[in-house]
């Protein structure tokens, strides 16, 4: 999994990416959010489910807001909050390519792409590691 850091610059209340043009305007913004990490390689899954953990530790993170937004004509925002085991699930997501964002106050947000496909390996899941800090 290749991870790159994208730093947000706040100009007159507008969010602008310093490195790329990943669309985040429709996603929820944490009150303390200043750093967003991007996972470059897309997750390929049969359904949108997975786990969020603390970076470099197996400690699950509860209370992480995971949002996905379709590309093209399917711009509907779908969301889930990770449970005490760090697990989340968004039901009824049709096949396609989606942007995602994981956010929790006090942590650096994570963005990336996921591909929902019936051809994905069984048991495939989204695995997100979040860094402490804003």
Please describe what each predicted stretch is.
Residues 50-62:
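Structural motif
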């Amino acid at each position: 999994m290749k991870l790159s850091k994208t730093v947000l610059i706040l100009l007159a209340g507008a969010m602008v990416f310093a490195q790329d043009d990943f669309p985040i305007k429709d996603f929820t913004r944490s009150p303390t959010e200043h750093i967003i990490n991007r996972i470059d390689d897309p997750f390929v899954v049969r359904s949108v489910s997975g786990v969020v953990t603390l970076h470099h530790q197996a400690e699950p993170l509860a209370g992480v807001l995971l949002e996905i937004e379709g590309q093209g004509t399917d711009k509907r925002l779908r969301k889930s909050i990770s449970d005490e085991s760090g697990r989340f699930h968004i039901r009824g997501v049709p096949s396609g390519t989606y942007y995602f964002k994981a956010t929790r106050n006090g942590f650096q947000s994570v963005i990336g792409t996921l591909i929902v496909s019936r051809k994905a390996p069984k048991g495939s899941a989204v695995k997100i590691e979040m860094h402490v800090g804003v």
